[in-house]
Amino acid sequence: MAGQKIRIRLKAYDHEAIDASAKKIVETVTRTGARVVGPVPLPTEKNVYCVIRSPHKDKDSREHFEMRTHKRLIDILDPTPKTVDALMRIDLPASVDVNIQ
């Protein structure tokens, strides 16, 4: 697989879980002999939701909730078949969304 590249995008709401997953992927890939670029932190997506506190009146009293989505990008250069096999077997938390291109 010379000259090829695998791009992995990680998404999670918890920054500690995504950093631990990225570290685990980088360690696994370097152990198999491929080169790694990253993890590159991508901009955090912040969604803010405004909710009225009272169920029936007092519209001026509102509460704000926010949800942050953290993202990381990892590029694997010149992957070997051993690297691809190791990536398929790696165990990551369910809270981390992995997209492999």
From Swiss-Prot:
It comes from the Bacteria. Involved in the binding of tRNA to the ribosomes. This is Small ribosomal subunit protein uS10. The keyword Ribonucleoprotein applies. Belongs to the universal ribosomal protein uS10 family. The keyword Ribonucleoprotein applies. Coiled coil: none annotated. Keywords: Ribonucleoprotein, Ribosomal protein. GO terms for molecular function: structural constituent of ribosome; tRNA binding. Part of the 30S ribosomal subunit. PANTHER family: 30S RIBOSOMAL PROTEIN S10 FAMILY MEMBER. Pfam families: Ribosomal_S10 (PF00338). One of its GO terms (cellular component) is ribonucleoprotein complex. InterPro entries: Ribosomal_uS10, Ribosomal_uS10_CS, Ribosomal_uS10_dom, Ribosomal_uS10_dom_sf. GO terms for biological process: translation.
